Amino acid sequence: MNRAILSQRITSILADLNRLTNALYAMNTTDIQRYPDNYEVLSTDAALRAENIACRLRHLIYSTTSIKKEEYLTSAAVMQGIKVDENDGVLEITLPCLLPKRKQRQSTEYLLDPFTAAMSQYARSRPLPRLQHCVVCFSHVYCQDLPKRQVRDYDNLELKQFLDVAASFILTDDSGLLCDAYNTNELGETDCTRISIT
């Protein structure tokens, strides 16, 4: 990559890091009890900005180093805490956050790419069944310490892309005739999403 273009991209990321830092300072000084809407806007902006920065840095790594995308994303999956396990015939996937809202492309990429790498690594380490009919349950776990109004509608969440990735490894077809999908909300110690497939 041309050094001038590389420098321009790094400078752009540094500018976004400054904006992220400012958003975090603003979050830290905002009274969440008195100004919950302001806090929501600030925290959403900070999270999306951080995810955008991470994705841009990934693309920089892919285009400027010899590190393979799959290798990096496997490390990213571990760092994010993405877990894939099988217990008593149920494939259990844990994502370290709530699923992104639809139409937040960068946010989806941030989580979806490492999730795909984690599924691929898991499939290489042990044989996975090819299910013809299955039940999928998305458990949206919300931190019990946060206000209950944080609970979101299912129809605003990006479920399909995550189901498509899982389906590519274990389902013969994710057609509505062969795959029953359910959603549930829970309160827990921290935000996360659990996907159970049987």
Please provide the spans of the model-predicted regions.
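Short, low-complexity, polybasic intrinsically disordered segments
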Residues: R149-A166
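Short amphipathic
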Residues: K83-L99, C137-Y142
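Long, charged, low-complexity intrinsically disordered regions
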Residues: N87-V90, Q104-E109
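C-terminal edge-of-domain segments
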Residues: S175-T198
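Short conserved catalytic/interaction loops centered on acidic-Pro-aromatic/His motifs
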Residues: R149, S168-L178
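An N-terminal amphipathic alpha-helical segment
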Residues: S107-Q150
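N-terminal targeting/trafficking signals and adjacent low-complexity tails
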Residues: M1-Y72, A76-G81, D85-G89
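Short glycine/proline-enriched loop/turn "hinge" motifs that connect secondary-structure elements
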Residues: K83-N87, P127-Q132, L187
